[in-house]
Structure formats: C-alpha cells, structure tokens
Amino acid sequence: MGCYHFHLNQLSRGKGQSAVASAAYRAGAKMRSTYYGEWNDYTRKGGVILAEIHLPKHAPERFKDRETLWNEVEWMEGNKKAQLAHSFDIALMNEFSMEENMKLARRFVEEQLVARGMIADLAIHNPKTGMNVW
C-alpha cells in the first residue's frame, strides 16, 4: 500500500506569496508577474511531467494560458492580505502507472473542482526528481 499524503495550503499575499511565482514553479515555466513586475523562471527545475489548466464551462478561454490566468488573479485580488489560491499536494500511488495516476489526478480535478465552478492548474512532478506534487 502506498503512502497517503493529502495536504491543502492557502496561497496568501499576506504571507508574501505570489500566485504567478507559485504557478511558474509548479509548471516548471518562465512567467512574468505584472503585479510585482518580476520574472519567475523555473525552466531549469525539471521533473514536471504534466502541467495543464482545467476550466469550467463559464470560464474565459484566455485562462487556458497559465500566465494570463495567474496575473489576472493577482490583479483581481488586490487586498494586501488576499487569499490568492488553494494548493493541494497529493502523493501519487506507487502501485499505479504514471498514466493511471494522471487519469486519477484529472478525474479528481474535474469532479471536485471544475464541476464546482473552479479553475484548476494541475501539475504532476516526476517522483524520481522530487515530491509528487499537483
């Protein structure tokens, strides 16, 4: 039986956190925060094997672009103590193939978040290079 790990965090500007920087890290991407005027480059981080945006039907298609989505969140939540997002860190099952784990992750995101009108930015990291985080 695999190790069970399910952790929920709040991403908060009050803690000095940036939604754009966090999304860039999880996706292993380079993104510019227009709110803070800085670049966040995690392209050399490696280990990201899946990074995709899941939108509910009512969400604008432009939010399929990670940088657009998270910059809009930064600007819409202007309060200095704003809660910008929630992050789920979940261990994948060692007994399942990566394809099976991806299918389970997508199902969780679609059924528990997107079906309730939320946008989900899903990232899966290679277990050989670090934690399984999505």
Question: Which residues does each predicted region cover?
Answer:
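N-terminal nicking endonuclease/strand-transfer module with a His-rich metal-binding environment
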Residues: 1-134
